[in-house]
Amino acid sequence: MSKKKILLLLGGPSKERKVSLSTGRAVYLALRKLGYEVIKFDPKIGSKFFLQYNCDLAFNALHGQFGEDGTIQSLLERQKIPYTHSGVKSSAIAMDKLKSKKKFIKAKIKTPEFKVIKKISDLNNIISKKKFVLKPINEGSSVGVVICKNLSSLNKVEVKMYLKKYGKLLQEEFIEGKEVQAAVMGSKALGAIEIKPSRNFYDYNAKYSRNAKTKHIMPANLEKKIYNKVLQIAFRAHKCLSCRGVTRSDFRVTRDNEIYILETNTQPGMTPLSLVPEIADYSGIAFVKLIKWMVLDASTNR
């Protein structure tokens, strides 16, 4: 039986392009090690050039808009090309922080208090009286995220610029506590890792720079009961968004062991510094084995 021919989608047009290229390189090496024939393709918005390749499936190594928001998934579905990760609807919902929060609330999964900000005056609310976060509704990798001690410390010129750029922002209560991220693989939560950035915030640089000095604590330093509860909630989030394949959910765990979900990522990074491969490896699943599972899990109608 001949090995599958795989179309590896990487790069793309989003602000997370560099991360996607890094994920793509790691995935490419794993796929080649597994003996698959691999064609790398760097798509642009609306591009259907990949249809010229007669491949058995597409491995989606894209991050951010176009690759993570249901767009590329829709193109692949229309052409009946099997692909990895989540489907059209779940990708679109997970990428939209407002829609995913509403799903979490409906599923009784605790998430920080929030408000949609369309203009500066919308910030005159109860959340603004304490520490809060402003973030774009449809970006990943902490792109455009601002942490504010209170409303008076906010750079309103910067906020106006962001509103012009993104249209609207999500204002979210800042939860003090441990930063914990959990991975789900199919029908199983694999584990949870604690992140300790050298700075106050696990931003883009802390996630992807080798010089960031971010500490990874695996497994997360939590009481066993709380650790298991984080895993249970990560799996519930995966299910309530109808996700497929591998996901990573981000949490804050307070001193009182209250667990708040921040978001679920349907296209978690697979770079050398990424968390899902580290969690999987601790769980006994080497990177190559993880990639093989994702290939075997690929399908349409996701």
What is the predicted function of each stretch?
Residues M1-K89, I93-M95, K99, K118-N124, ...:
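ATP-binding N-terminal substructure of ATP-dependent carboxylate-amine bond-forming enzymes
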Residues M1-L10, V38, F50, I93-K178:
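Active-site nucleotide/adenylate-binding loops and adjacent lid/helix of ATP-dependent enzymes
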Residues S74-Y83, N150-N155, Y282-I285:
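A glycine- and small-aliphatic-rich helix-loop capping segment at beta-alpha/alpha-beta transitions
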Residues K149-Q232, V253-Y260:
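Phosphate-binding site of ATP-dependent enzymes
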Residues E173, V184, H238-M270, A280:
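Conserved metal-phosphate-binding beta-hairpin within the catalytic cores
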Residues E194-T247, E278-R302:
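Active-site "cap" helix and flanking loop/linker of ATP-utilizing ligase/carboxylase catalytic domains
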